[in-house]
Amino acid sequence: INENQATLPVINDLKYKITSKTCVVIASSPCYPYGLIDNITDIGLICKDYDVPLHVDACLGGFITQFDESIKISFTDNISSISVDPHKFGYVPKGSSLLLWKNNKIRPNQYFITEDWTGGIYASCSLPGSRVGSQIATTWAILIYNGLDYYKCMSKLIIKNTKKLYNDIIKIPTIKVIGKPNVNVLAFYSDKYPLGQIIDEFQKHNWNLNIMQNPMCLHICITPYNYEKINEITDILQNITTQEVRNETKGLISIYGMAEKIPNKKIVREIVEKYLDLTTNL
């Protein structure tokens, strides 16, 4: 999706992209860059018609959307699988991602089994060959400790403040919000002020926002640790609109801007590959 598709995926376009080689269709609830939820119900109907599995990436919003009847997802929407990250808004240790299957008939497709290994019969139910038991125990303990009521309350507050931030920002001249986010992430840009100038202003007030590309924008994730301070975001943006335009760019914004303008993305990939070589060199 792009900034001009506030209504989310163009369903008719999806129909034409499904072929005999399509193994799965993936939808987001919500997507990471803009916090927008795909039209999962309609996508599910198409997947049913074409007999293609539908996976929903709910890693970012799984612990938020499921407590709001207007945006929650369900396997009844012709969904085959759902991914959720408890280590995000479940607040458990990193590395506790979940893959939920509609039924046991589908699940064996993720198994790895070899019967003729010299070390014996080897089987794993997931990509990691083994899992640390303490990770599973800690995840379970924290979920039980926080409790269902905590997650319901957290979800309600985050959705409420995300909608408030959206309604406040769209009133600010020259500042544009991408789509109409209603979960926990919001992305914005300016049709007048360079992104670098906006970033500098936020950093002066100890806010570090993530830089997105295609299109270039900033996004913020609303959490229990910052929702009480979201008025600062609108205050900073209001202050920016009183400034003169400054066109200098520096830091990450320069890198992202350069990468977006390079037509051959293979070059970008090679540069990043060299960077990873340097950072992992012994």
For each of these PLM feature ranges, what is it?
Residues T7-H55:
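Active-site phosphate-binding strand-loop segment of PLP-dependent enzymes
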Residues G62-D68:
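Conserved, charged catalytic cores of large soluble enzymes
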Residues C31, L60-G62, K88, P215, ...:
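Active-site-proximal loop/turn and secondary-structure-junction residues that shape catalytic pockets
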Residues C23, Y50, H55, I71-V183, ...:
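Active-site C-terminal subdomain of aminotransferase-like
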Residues I1-A6:
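Short beta->alpha junction loops
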Residues S28-P33, N184-F188, H219-I220:
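Conserved short loop/turn motifs at secondary-structure junctions
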Residues K152-M154, T162-K164, I170-P173, F188-L282:
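Non-catalytic terminal extensions of PLP-dependent enzymes
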